[in-house]
Regions:
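Hydrophobic, small-residue-rich alpha-helical packing segments that form membrane-like cores
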Residues: 1-59, 65-68, 72-84
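Contiguous transmembrane helix-bundle modules in multi-pass membrane proteins
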Residues: 9-16, 66-242
Length: 242
C-alpha cells in the first residue's frame, strides 16, 4: 500500500475506512456464527461509515495538501462536515440510547476462532487509528502553533504498518486451524508444527536461490504468503480426507 503512493494523505483517507470495513466483516462473521460481538459490530459499522465521510471531507475541503486532492471548495467542505456530524453523531446517539441488545453469554477460550478474530479486530482498529493520527497530525500541529507547518512522511507509516502487517499475517496462518468455542490443543499444535517446518524449508530455498534479489520487506511478504497458503492447503486437504 505504501509503495507507489508514498503514504499520500488522500490515499490514507481511503485506507482508513478500508481497514475498519475489513474489521467489520470479520466481526460480523463472529456475530453470525456465535451471536456475540453484536454491539461491537454496530460500532464498527458506524466508525467505518464515519471514516468514509471523513475521507470525503479531507479530500474535497482543501485542508489537506496533496496532488490527489480535488474540488477544493471550502463551502463544499463545510457542507460535507455538516453531513458527517449529522449522521455520525446521530448514529452514536441512537446507539447509546436505543440499543436494546442484551449481552449473550457465550464461552470461548484463548485458542478459539472468536478470540483470534477479536485480535484481528483490535489490530486493524489500532492500525487505522495510527494511520489516521499520522495523516491529521500536521493539521493539528498547525492549528495549535499559529500556522507552523510540519509533515509526517513515509518513515512514520512504514514503522507503524510493517510490524502490524507481519503480525496479522502470522495470526492469519494460525487462525485457520482454530475452531469455534475451543480448539483441541494437540491437533492444533501438531498441524502448526508441520506447517512451520514446511515454511522454514521453503524459506531456506528462497534464501539460497534469490538471496541477492530479495530485500527484507519482500522476503517477509513471500514468507507470510507461503505461511497462509500452506495453512489453507492443509485445511483444504483435511476437509477432503474427512
Amino acid at each position: 500500500w505504501g509503495g507507489w503512493w508514498f503514504w499520500d494523505p488522500v490515499e490514507n483517507a481511503a485506507f482508513v475506512p478500508w481497514l475498519l470495513a475489513v474489521a467489520l466483516v470479520h466481526s460480523l462473521l463472529v456475530t453470525e456464527n456465535r451471536n456475540i460481538f453484536i454491539n461491537w459490530s454496530l460500532l464498527l459499522s458506524i466508525f467505518a461509515f464515519a471514516a468514509s465521510l471523513l475521507g470525503t471531507f479531507l479530500v474535497r475541503s482543501g485542508i489537506l495538501t496533496s496532488v490527489h486532492a480535488f474540488a477544493l471548495d471550502p463551502e463544499r467542505g463545510l457542507f460535507i462536515l455538516g453531513i458527517f456530524s449529522f449522521f455520525v453523531l446521530g448514529g452514536l446517539i441512537i446507539f447509546a440510547f436505543k440499543n436494546s441488545t442484551k449481552n449473550v453469554a457465550s464461552f470461548y477460550s484463548l485458542n478459539s476462532k472468536e478470540f483470534g478474530l477479536l485480535l484481528n479486530n483490535l489490530l486493524l482498529v489500532v492500525l487505522a487509528v495510527s494511520i489516521l493520527f499520522g495523516t491529521l497530525y500536521p493539521l493539528i500541529y498547525e492549528a495549535f502553533t499559529d500556522g507552523k507547518q510540519i509533515s509526517v512522511g513515509a518513515p512514520y507509516f512504514e514503522f507503524i504498518i510493517f510490524p502490524f502487517a507481519i503480525l496479522l499475517g502470522l495470526l492469519q496462518g494460525i487462525a485457520l486451524y482454530l475452531s469455534w468455542g475451543s480448539t483441541k490443543s494437540f491437533s492444533f499444535i501438531g498441524k502448526l508444527i508441520v506447517e512451520s517446518i514446511s515454511i522454514f524449508l521453503l524459506t531456506l530455498v528462497l534464501l539460497f536461490i534469490l538471496f541477492d534479489e530479495l530485500i527484507s520487506a519482500s522476503f517477509f511478504t513471500v514468507f507470510i504468503f507461503a505461511w497462509i497458503l500452506a495453512g489453507s492447503l492443509m485445511i483444504n486437504f483435511s476437509f477432503k480426507s474427512a
